């Protein structure tokens, strides 16, 4: 069964969205376990804030990198389709 570029692209987009959603769910679960800020010392509050920022930054970077990989795969797939088309229908 041949896969079209649109099908391939849509599948990668769905996977990117699903991955992003799962990362957000994991982060939400993690942040939900944070103790009440009123019970934290200023040092621990600062520690939690830095850690939350770091997790959010890493999540954003990772999601961006996954999206970049997907775009690269889409480009390569389009190139392969063009090569296949050229091989099947060589110009005279």
From Swiss-Prot:
* Gene Ontology CC: cytoplasm; microtubule; microtubule cytoskeleton
**Subcellular compartments:** Cytoplasm, Cytoskeleton
Provide the alphabetized UniProt keywords.
Cytoplasm, Cytoskeleton, Glycoprotein, Methylation, Microtubule
- The answer, when asked if Metal-binding is one of the entry's keywords, is no
| GO biological process terms on file | cytoskeleton organization; defense response; positive regulation of cell population proliferation
One Pfam family this sequence matches: KMP11
**Where on the tree of life does the source sit, at the highest rank?**
Eukaryota
In what way is this protein post-translationally modified?
Answer: A minor in vivo processed fragment (IVP) also exists, probably as a result of proteolysis. Probably O-glycosylated. Contains equimolar amounts of galactosamine, galactose, glucose and mannose.
Main localization of the protein? Answer: cytoplasm
Which residues does the record list as Omega-N-methylarginine (modified residue)? 45
- Briefly state the protein's biological role: May be involved in the regulation of the cytoskeleton through interaction with the subpellicular microtubules. May be involved in parasite mobility and attachment to the surface of the host cell. Strongly stimulates T-cell proliferation and is thought to play a role in the immunology of leishmaniasis.
Quaternary state and interactors: Monomer.
Family under the similarity heading: Belongs to the KMP-11 family.
Name listed for the protein in its UniProt record: Kinetoplastid membrane protein 11
Supply the source organism for this entry: Leishmania donovani
Query: What's the source species' lineage?
Result: Eukaryota, Discoba, Euglenozoa, Kinetoplastea, Metakinetoplastina
Gene expressing this chain: KMP-11
């Amino acid at each position: 069964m041949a896969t079209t570029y649109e099908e391939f692209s849509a599948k990668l987009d769905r996977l990117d969205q699903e991955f992003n959603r799962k990362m957000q769910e994991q982060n939400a679960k993690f942040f939900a376990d944070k103790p009440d800020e009123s019970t934290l010392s200023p040092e621990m509050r600062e520690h939690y804030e830095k850690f939350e920022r770091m997790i959010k930054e890493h999540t954003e970077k990772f999601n961006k990198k996954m999206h970049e990989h997907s775009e690269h795969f889409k480009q390569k797939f389009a190139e392969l389709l063009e090569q296949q088309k050229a091989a099947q229908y060589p110009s005279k």
